[in-house]
Amino acid sequence: MENTLGLEIIEVVEQAAIASAKWMGKGEKNTADQVAVEAMRERMNKIYMRGRIVIGEGERDDAPMLYIGEEVGICTQPNADQLCNPDELVEIDIAVDPCEGTNLVAYGQPGSMAVLAISEKGGLFAAPDFYMKKLAAPPAAKGKVDINKSATENLKILSECLDRAIDELVVVVMKRDRHQGLIKEIRDAGARVQLISDGDVGAAISCGFAGTNIHALMGIGAAPEGVISAAAMRALGGHFQGQLIYDPEVVKTGLIGESKEANLERLSSMGINDPDKVYDAHELASGETVLFAACGITSGNLMQGVRFFHGGARTQSLVISSQSQTARFVDTIHMAGQPKTVQLH
């Protein structure tokens, strides 16, 4: 799967990032997201595959495209029987976030990206649109830190695993009222906190790379993005754990349903019978082969954002494979239109 789809998915996230970047700084987050969705879907439908969206832009009734359950790829088109050989057909599950950090794009802030993860059919956890408690850490701390331990305990473990003083550690936390206690505990333990307004996928992945100066991600964010982060961290060999949050009181919002009871019923209907289960990266991205791809929209810790020039754009992307255990950064020049002839007099 890596050999056939690796380059293709890079182009998918590149096209989404370029489309969204044209709306950078214009204050229109919905448009920045919409054009990314359209560009991503258009490029996906040119790939020789039968793909199914398991994490996307929402339920079918709420999203016109890249909705959960939508099929994409050449082999899902009306004339697929003429184009695709069933014996060669690649069936995959896809998790997408065409514009991770819509507010970041709208206001010209760093860290937004177009991201996706793919695996063979059944290889990605179809997370509900709930919140998720998350813990990400570098490979050296894999299996040693634990989401059920306090932040103070985990920082001591991180310090030992990384051979760094606690006051040298940087923990990324989303700037939300629900995290006030967590932020205080991290600071009281002696570590430093980097607050972000949106986009925790990039923060989670940064834990997997040396030199990013990010040593952990802690706190509660969106569950679908947790699966995408887990896919990348599994391939990187980093630590990732997630636990679904189904009680609106925990996050002080009704976005995950009106009541704890209703949410428990919804989880049960999805076949999730242990709502308090802590998932690791291999459970959230369980496929034999997992591929992750991202392209910077605005510049961040890992990647440069889209840079436009007359007649084209330059992008920086990242593709991570669990199969080959590689992470490749790809620098691409996109040339649009016909070159102009310069006449000298």
UniProtKB/Swiss-Prot annotation:
Binding of Mn(2+) 2, residues: D97, E100, E225
Top EC class, one word: hydrolase
CDD domains (UniProt xref): FBPase_glpX
Keyword set includes Zinc: no
GO CC annotations, alphabetized: cytosol
Enzyme Commission number(s) of this protein: 3.1.3.11, 3.1.3.37
Organism whose genome encodes this protein: Trichormus variabilis (strain ATCC 29413 / PCC 7937) (Anabaena variabilis)
Protein name: D-fructose 1,6-bisphosphatase class 2/sedoheptulose 1,7-bisphosphatase
Cofactor: Mn(2+)
Keywords from the UniProt entry: Calvin cycle, Carbohydrate metabolism, Hydrolase, Manganese, Metal-binding
Annotated InterPro entries: FBPase_class-2/SBPase
Pathway as given in its UniProt record: Carbohydrate biosynthesis; Calvin cycle
Residues involved in substrate binding: E100, G101, T102, Y131, R176, D177, R178, D198, G199, D200
